[in-house]
Regions:
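Short S/T/G/P-rich N-terminal loop/turn motif that feeds into the first structured element of a domain
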Residues: 1-36, 43-192
Length: 192
């Protein structure tokens, strides 16, 4: 995994960030499972589409170095809130969800009005974001913490909050995973 991460940091990330319309990238990994997620954010759909041809060889090389087959998902940044910036040693808990596409706005409102304020009270909380795929009814929420220890200490509180709010939002939890945040250069604006 280290060779893939080194390639991403040294070559892929600088190349993508230099592309017109790129507003940042992030990378998180779970070294135990080998799962690595790299995100790029764009100022518009046109900007993202214009980068496709240049990104494919970088993505393919990263996949080979990481020992896996990369796949692409496209998400709308629906909400983003930073309590404070992340730093080296920060970690991320991500939750993938699915519900009826027509309920996504209800879920977004709950995230903004209930989930984010509750998360701000958790020790070590840095930021939270919600991404939507309106066509499929899928969503992913990520919460960043100052350290693995703080993320672990909040696990029970986060689980209770997640179960309560996903029930109210009428969404099913597909997966929950925890990652080390290896790169956080996202310049997307606050959207709370």
């Amino acid at each position: 995994m280290d060779a893939g991460i080194d390639f991403l940091r040294a070559e892929a990330v600088p190349a993508v960030q230099a592309m017109p319309g790129c507003i940042g990238m992030s990378m998180m990994a779970d070294r135990m499972s080998g799962r690595c997620i790299v995100t790029s954010s764009w100022d518009s759909m046109d900007g993202m589409r214009a980068s496709d041809a240049a990104i494919v060889p970088l993505r393919d090389r990263a996949g080979k170095l990481l020992g896996g087959m990369p796949f692409v998902e496209e998400w709308e940044i629906a909400a983003m809130h930073r309590h404070h910036r992340s730093h080296e040693g920060s970690c991320v808990r991500a939750t993938w969800m699915h519900g009826a596409a027509e309920d996504l706005d209800r879920g977004l409102d709950l995230f903004k009005m209930v989930t984010m304020p509750a998360m701000e009270a958790l020790e070590g909380f840095c930021s939270a974001s919600l991404f939507l795929d309106r066509a499929t009814g899928r969503a992913v929420m990520s919460a960043t913490y100052d350290s693995r220890e703080m993320m672990t200490a909040t696990r029970d509180q986060a689980t209770e909050l997640r179960l309560r709010t996903t029930k109210e939002a009428r969404v099913d939890i597909l997966d929950v995973a925890e990652f080390d945040l290896l790169l956080a250069h996202l310049r997307a604006p606050e959207m709370a």
